[in-house]
A protein has these predicted regions:
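Cytosolic regulatory regions of ion transport systems
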Residues: 1-176
Length: 176
């Protein structure tokens, strides 16, 4: 999967590192060269110096072939504009980090999709969800929501003596 991340701050860099470990083709773009220093040598990612609202920079990054474009700079307007441009250039899916809670209203989803923004990330809501999930399931080490929460995958730690270790799920859950 070809992924372009605009914004090499804490969120963008962390995301790029995670995707690098999953062997995704990842390009991290930022207008500040100091934020990109060493990342391409320490991790399996490409770095690119450029503004996410520059059409030329987006084209050079290969946005027209991107499966996913994620804009996570600290500037909400820049993120939204970058996604609109990336969509127009040909990115298949776009995600913008936002600061305005109002934008998360489900009635606005079609509006943002028309603009070319497929998903919105609001960091405070994500953090709150993680805290709530942690309180509900303190025994869970990792949690992944797949397909918008339709499927939830959990990572748990088991003792070596646990009876379910090395058992196929089919046997644990039964035939249905």
């Amino acid at each position: 999967m070809k992924i372009i991340i605009a914004g090499a701050g804490a969120v963008g860099t962390h995301l790029a590192k995670l995707l690098s470990r999953e062997h995704q083709e990842c390009t991290l773009m930022d207008a500040d060269p100091s934020r990109l220093e060493g990342l391409d040598t320490d991790y399996d990612i490409m770095t690119m110096l450029g503004s996410p609202t520059s059409i030329k920079a987006l084209q050079e990054a290969g946005t027209d072939e991107a499966d996913l474009f994620v804009a996570v700079t600290p500037d909400e307007s820049r993120n939204m504009n970058a996604c609109i441009l990336a969509h127009a250039i040909g990115a298949k899916k776009t995600v913008a980090r936002i600061d305005n809670y109002e934008y998360l209203d489900t009635k606005l989803k079609p509006f943002f999709r028309k603009l070319g923004i497929d998903s919105l990330i609001y960091p405070e809501v994500l953090a709150a969800q993680d805290i709530i999930n942690g309180l509900k399931m303190s025994w869970v080490r990792q949690r992944w929501d797949v397909h918008g929460g339709a499927l939830v995958m959990l990572g748990v730690k088991l003792r070596e003596t646990c009876e379910i270790l090395n058992q196929p799920l089919k046997e644990l859950c039964g035939p249905d």
